[in-house]
């Protein structure tokens, strides 16, 4: 009985840990830029740390990366959509946007994913789920339109820039949902994504003058970069564990925890305060996420069993 109870609680515990870690990353983004990290430079070093950790994980499992032409193309595309572009945008926005507000924009990912998937015909139209998309749009309007929503009106374009990151992640989700990509596995995909993101960002950081070398004395900048890389690696691996334990639909609830954790971390670390408009945006965004998340069907049971087999 105790073992059964523990088995039921484990996915919830993993969900909370994963959400808390990813939620912390928004505050760390503000810390790393305040410590002197440049957007392109931080994106490069974060990708290096995360990629090396996941590479060690894949090698330990004797499931190394496949480096034929097809897989290289996949790694480059997901590196651009899932790391290089969205991470850089987030780090450009981080100095100007509260950590809690940054975390709200991430909730747009599943909402935008459904909107784009419906537009290209890979998802069926659903009035309920479209209502969720509308809620997402309303939530962002509540953030950027009212005069009193943000501490400074100067933050508005940076909030919209952060929303572009969500668009990138949504496009990545749609690309990775293609059946022809399912043989790679999520952990190896994340490993290849980060290693290739580092390769992409290296010349960009050097050419833009944003490359920096971490100090061997390890100050705030260096520890925060390591923390960001560790969070991405650990949280992503935990995400795979949750899928295996409880299925992808259960794991999709991560968005709720990440947003709330991001807001709470911002309050705890920076003493952030939010207007009624921001809190209202959180509620509307959560409603949108709930509406756009697909309902479980009988067919999902088999999908849950196979969701992470190739990892």
What label would you give each PLM region?
Residues 1-41, 45, 151-178, 199, ...:
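Glycine-/small-residue-enriched transmembrane alpha-helix faces in small-molecule transporters
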Residues 7-11, 36-44, 67-73, 145-168, ...:
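Juxtamembrane helix-entry segments on the extracytoplasmic side of multipass membrane proteins
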Residues 10, 34-85, 112-113, 167-172, ...:
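Transmembrane alpha-helices of multi-pass small-molecule transport proteins
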Residues 54, 125-147, 201, 256, ...:
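Hydrophobic transmembrane alpha-helices of multi-pass small-molecule transport proteins
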Residues 54, 113-115, 119, 150-211, ...:
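Transmembrane alpha-helical segments that form core, pore/gating elements
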Residues 53, 58-62, 90, 109-134, ...:
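C-terminal transmembrane-helix exit sites in multi-pass transporters
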Residues 42-45, 83, 87, 101-108, ...:
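Helix-helix packing/entry segments at the starts of transmembrane helices
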Residues 21, 25-26, 55-106, 142, ...:
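Specific transmembrane alpha-helical segments of multi-pass solute transporters/efflux pumps
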């Amino acid at each position: 009985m105790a073992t059964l109870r523990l088995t039921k609680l484990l996915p919830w515990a993993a969900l909370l840990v994963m959400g808390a870690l990813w939620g912390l990353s928004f505050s760390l983004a503000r810390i790393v830029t305040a410590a002197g990290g440049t957007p392109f430079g931080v994106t490069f070093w974060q990708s290096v740390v995360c990629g090396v950790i996941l590479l060690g994980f894949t090698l330990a499992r004797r499931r190394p990366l496949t480096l034929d032409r097809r897989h290289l193309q996949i790694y480059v595309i997901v590196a651009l959509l899932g790391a290089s572009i969205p991470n850089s945008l987030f780090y450009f926005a981080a100095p100007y946007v509260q950590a809690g507000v940054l975390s709200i924009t991430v909730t747009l990912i599943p909402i935008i994913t459904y909107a784009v998937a419906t537009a290209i015909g890979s998802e069926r139209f659903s009035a309920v789920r479209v209502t969720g998309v509308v809620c997402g749009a309303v939530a962002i309007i509540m953030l950027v339109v009212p005069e009193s929503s943000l501490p400074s009106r100067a933050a508005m374009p940076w909030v919209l820039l952060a929303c572009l990151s969500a668009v990138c992640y949504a496009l990545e989700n749609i690309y990775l949902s293609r059946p022809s990509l399912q043989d790679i596995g999520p952990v190896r995909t994340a490993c290849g994504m980060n290693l290739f993101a580092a390769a992409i960002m290296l010349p960009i950081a050097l050419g833009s003058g944003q490359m920096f070398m971490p100090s061997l004395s390890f100050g705030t900048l260096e520890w925060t970069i390591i923390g960001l890389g560790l969070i991405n690696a650990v949280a992503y691996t935990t995400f795979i564990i949750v899928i295996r334990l409880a299925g992808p639909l259960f794991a999709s609830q991560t968005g709720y925890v990440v947003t709330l954790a991001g807001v709470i971390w911002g309050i705890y670390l920076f003493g952030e305060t939010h207007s009624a408009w921001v809190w209202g945006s959180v509620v509307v965004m959560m409603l949108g996420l709930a509406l756009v998340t697909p309902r479980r069907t009988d067919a999902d049971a088999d999908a849950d069993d196979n969701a992470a087999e190739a990892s």
